[in-house]
Amino acid sequence: MVSSPVASRIDAVSRFAREHGWHLMFQDRLGSGHPFDWVGDGVVATIRDDRRQLAYLRHLASLGIPIVDMTCDRPDFPCARVSCNHVEAGRLAAGHFLERNYRSLVFFTIDWGNGRERFWRGFSSAGSPGKWVFSAECPNARWNDWGAVSNWLERKFASAPKPLGALTYSQAESVLLLSAARRLGIRVPEDLGIVSGGEDKALLECQPVPITAVDMDMGRGAYEAAELLQRLMDGEAAPARAVEFPPRRIIARRSTDATVASDKLVRAAIELFASGLKSGVNVESAARALGVSRNTLNRRISAELGRTASAELQRQRLMMAKRLLADPKNKVEYVARMAGFSSASHLGSALRADCGLTPMSFRM
């Protein structure tokens, strides 16, 4: 396995190796000591732009060793591929922002390439987002010069519309974006919503504002890559096209925990919905607390958000439930009660209607 040390990928390939009696070796793709004298039966890899890794993999391919790539970044490298559908991932992120009423969107990345282009294609299908590509605007700067990237981001923020929804290609880019925003006093998520194009729970949950991510289901991809490699080692011909699978879901965290609204009454209603879930707030009681009729509240919310007041309240309940379900210590009954559902079965029905998952499968 020649890859960056992503735990979900390593765990999945290791599981397949145990199940099928493989002798698995791991080589960091960025390492300098690639073992050119190694002669094995097959390789699963994450193929990027590192010259040493490419030279090593070309050497292995010249020996007739089958290779399965777990990314879509280097389609020019001749090998079998299994990767997440990046176009669908970009589209999923755009839908997440639009559901929260972020109308100005931007895609931020340090560099460009096939995977990023596919993310952008899906993201831009929802409208006309901006594109911030550091390497295109600062071609003489190093991609890992975080000071230069940060200064450039501050200049971009100065002229950007707000509220702004920003999708990044990688976890590291989302953390950098959050850091630059905090230095400028830009509120996240009120003025800037952030979605990372990759999930890394350990990194994204420890941020001052935990960052929402697209779950690219890398564990599934790695396991399917190992399955394909086994078939290639058994003599099966490589598929003519890359094997793609859909992104699993959006993992919502605080960086997009807002519904953008210009109407003060709508903002107040959203805040009331969110704060009153545990106490059983409904549209009628919210309208009464805000001093307007139910019809007025429904009309104003529909005009601002494009959905009814009841639909927005249900969305707030589901957002709360999903956040609580992310912690395995929270029992489903507790989650249902805190999110304003009448029972665990009521929550289960709502979650299945929303994303096709039960509370237990949502946690997996």
Language model regions located:
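Bacterial carbohydrate/catabolite-sensing allosteric modules
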Residues: 1-47, 51-289, 298, 315, ...
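Basic/polar phosphate-binding segments, predominantly the helix-turn-helix DNA-binding elements
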Residues: 283-313, 336-361
